[in-house]
Regions:
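Extracellular/periplasmic carbohydrate-active domains that bind, remodel
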Residues: 20-497
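Hydrophobic h-region of N-terminal signal peptides that target proteins for export
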Residues: 12-20
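Bacterial N-terminal signal peptides that target proteins for export
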Residues: 1-9
C-alpha cells in the first residue's frame, strides 16, 4: 500500500539523518554544568549553533542535571541525552520563550529546520508543576498578563517539553519526557517524523497531552509508553488548509484521564490514511478511541487493528459536529477491528492528581457511540472482531432514557458541544448507540453486560444501510425476553446470524 511505502521512506530518512557525517560534541566541553543549579541556556544554544554551522552532529549530555530555559535545535543537530543525564527546565517562567512563529512556549524548540532529533536514554523534564504555579504567582503580582481562566495560565503561555514547527526529518527516540507545564510534545506542520521508544510521564499539570500531531504528514510513532493527564495520542488540525496524512501508530501503550486515541478537538483541515496497530489502553477516564470532527475537518481512511482496552470508561466514540457555522465536516471509511475492551462500573482514574472531572449530573454507564448529526452522517464504518464487556447495573431510578420513537427523537443533537461520549448523560442503550449514519457494518461483534441493565443492547436511529453479521449479545438470564436491538427510522437493515 502507498501509505507503507511512504512510511518506509521515513525510516530510511531517520537512519540517514542520524549517521551521515555525525560528530559527537560533549555539552560540558562548551562549559555546560551538570550540577542541577547553573542555568545553561546560553551555553547550550551556543553549542547547538556551532554544531549546525560546522556540518552537524550530536550534542551529548552525559551524567548529571543540566538546567536550561528555552533552547532551539538547528539544522543537522541531534541532542543526545545519555542514561543518567537530564535536561531540567528552569523554575523561572521568564527563562522560557513564546516563539512568534509557533505562538507557543516551550523548553525545546525547533523552528523551520531539517534533520533534527533528540535521542538517548536520558530525560527531559520541564518541572512543569513548579513552573506553572510560579507563573500563576507572577500573574497575581502583575508580572504576567493573563485572565487566569480556570485559575491557570493559558496553554500557550506555559512551556511544553518539545515543540517542532514546520520541520522536516525529525527523529525522537529512546528518551523519557516528564512533567510539562502544558502539552508535552507538539509537532506542528512537520513532515517525516519518526518517534520510537519514548516513555512519557505527563501528569504534572492541566492540559498534559502525551503527543500532539498537528497538520503533519508521514509520521511513525511506535513502541511508546505514555501516561498522561490529558489526551495521549492526539491528532489535530489548526487551519482549514491543513493536512494530516500517512500516519502509523503501533505497539504503543496509553493511560489517560481523558482519551487515548484522539482526533480533535481542533479539526479544521483534512485527515487521511491513518493506521493504528497493536495498542494497549489501561485505566483511562474517557474513551479508548475518539474520532471526532466538529470544526469542518474531513476524516477518511482510518484503520485501527488490534487494540486491548482495560478499565477504560468508554471503548469507542465516533462523532461529527458543527461548532463553526457554515462548515461541513465529514467522516468516512473507518475500520476498527480485533478489539477487546472491558468497561468498569466505577470511575477509572479516581484518585489521580489531575483526574477527569466528577460529573454533576447522574448517568449510568454509557454505550459506545457512533453519532453524526443531521446532514453530516458517519459514513462507511466497519467494526469487525470486536468484544466488549460492560458492567451493567444501570438503575432507571438513578437516570433514565427510554427507547420509544418519541423518546429517541427527543435526544438533543448537541452539535455545537465539545465532543465527549458523556455529553448526553443517559443514553438509551448499554452497548452501542448509533445515530445519523450511513453504511454501518458490524461483523463478528460480541457485547456482554455483566449485570442487569434496563436498556436494550443496541439502539440505531436515522441510519441508512445497517448490516449486522454475527452480532452476539450476552446478558443476564433475567433479561432474556427483552428486545435487545431497537431501531427507529432505519433503512436497509440486515441482521444475519
Amino acid at each position: 500500500m502507498k501509505i507503507f511505502k511512504r512510511l518506509a521512506l521515513i525510516l530510511a530518512l531517520a537512519s540517514a539523518s542520524l549517521v551521515a557525517g555525525a560528530k559527537d560534541y560533549l555539552a560540558t566541553d562548551f562549559g555546560a554544568k551538570a550540577d542541577g543549579e547553573t542555568l545553561n541556556t546560553a551555553i547550550i544554544q551556543a553549542a547547538i549553533d556551532y554544531i549546525s554551522a560546522n556540518g552537524g552532529g550530536r550534542l551529548v549530555f552525559r551524567g548529571g542535571d543540566f538546567v536550561t530555559g528555552t533552547i532551539y535545535i538547528k539544522n543537522d543537530v541531534t541532542l543526545h541525552i545519555e542514561a543518567g543525564a537530564r535536561l531540567l527546565g528552569s523554575l523561572n517562567p521568564w527563562d522560557y520563550v513564546r516563539d512568534p512563529d509557533a505562538n507557543w512556549t516551550s523548553m525545546v524548540f525547533s523552528i523551520k529546520q531539517k534533520n533534527v532529533g533528540i535521542t538517548g536514554k536520558g530525560e527531559i523534564n520541564c518541572r512543569g508543576f513548579l513552573v506553572a504555579t510560579k507563573g500563576v504567582d507572577y500573574c497575581h503580582l502583575g508580572l504576567i498578563d493573563d485572565p487566569l481562566k480556570l485559575d491557570r495560565l493559558q496553554e500557550a503561555k506555559r512551556p511544553e517539553n518539545l515543540h517542532f514547527y514546520k520541520c522536516e526529518n525529525i527523529t525522537v527516540t529512546g528518551i523519557t519526557l516528564r512533567d510539562p507545564a502544558s502539552w508535552n510534545q507538539q509537532y506542528d506542520k512537520c513532515r517525516n517524523i519518526y518517534v520510537d521508544g519514548l516513555t512519557v510521564d505527563a501528569k504534572s499539570y492541566w492540559n498534559n497531552d502525551g503527543i500532539d500531531i498537528v497538520d503533519c504528514s508521514d509520521v511513525i510513532i511506535r513502541n511508546c509508553d505514555f501516561d498522561a493527564a490529558d489526551d495521549v495520542y492526539c491528532f489535530k488540525s489548526h487551519s482549514k488548509d491543513g493536512l494530516s496524512e500517512n500516519i502509523l501508530v503501533e505497539n504503543c501503550r496509553g493511560r489517560s484521564s481523558a482519551n487515548v486515541i484522539k482526533f480533535g478537538t481542533y479539526t479544521l483541515g483534512k485527515f487521511k490514511h491513518f493506521r493504528f496497530k497493536n495498542m494497549l489502553i489501561e485505566d483511562t477516564y474517557r474513551s479508548a478511541i475518539t474520532i471526532a470532527t466538529v470544526d469542518g475537518a474531513q476524516i477518511e481512511d482510518v484503520e485501527i487493528d488490534g487494540l486491548r482496552s482495560l478499565h477504560t470508561g468508554n471503548p469507542i466514540f465516533i462523532r461529527t459536529g458543527s461548532r463553526r457555522p457554515g462548515e461541513n465536516p465529514y467522516m468516512k471509511d473507518i475500520v476498527i477491528k480485533n478489539v477487546y475492551a472491558e468497561v468498569p462500573f466505577d470511575k477509572p482514574d479516581a484518585g489521580d492528581m489531575y483526574e477527569g472531572p466528577v460529573e454533576d449530573l447522574p448517568r449510568n454507564v454509557c454505550p459506545s457511540g457512533i453519532q453524526g448529526i443531521p446532514g453530516m452522517p458517519i459514513q462507511n464504518l466497519t467494526l469487525e472482531n470486536i468484544e466488549i464487556v460492560y458492567p451493567g447495573q444501570a438503575d432507571k431510578n438513578y437516570a433514565y432514557r427510554g427507547s420509544s420513537k418519541a423518546e429517541l427523537e427527543a435526544i438533543p443533537e448537541l452539535e455545537k458541544s465539545y465532543p465527549e461520549f458523556s455529553n448526553w448523560k443517559e443514553l438509551p442503550a448499554w452497548g452501542f448507540y448509533i445515530r445519523h449514519a450511513e453504511g454501518i457494518t458490524f461483523k463478528n461483534v460480541k457485547i456482554t453486560v455483566a449485570g442487569e441493565d434496563y436498556r436494550p443492547a443496541i439502539v440505531a436511529d436515522d441510519v441508512v444501510g445497517l448490516n449486522f453479521q454475527g452480532v452476539q449479545i450476552n446478558q443476564p438470564s433475567a433479561d432474556k425476553k427483552k428486545k435487545q436491538i431497537v431501531t427507529n427510522n432505519v433503512k436497509k437493515f440486515k441482521n444475519k446470524k
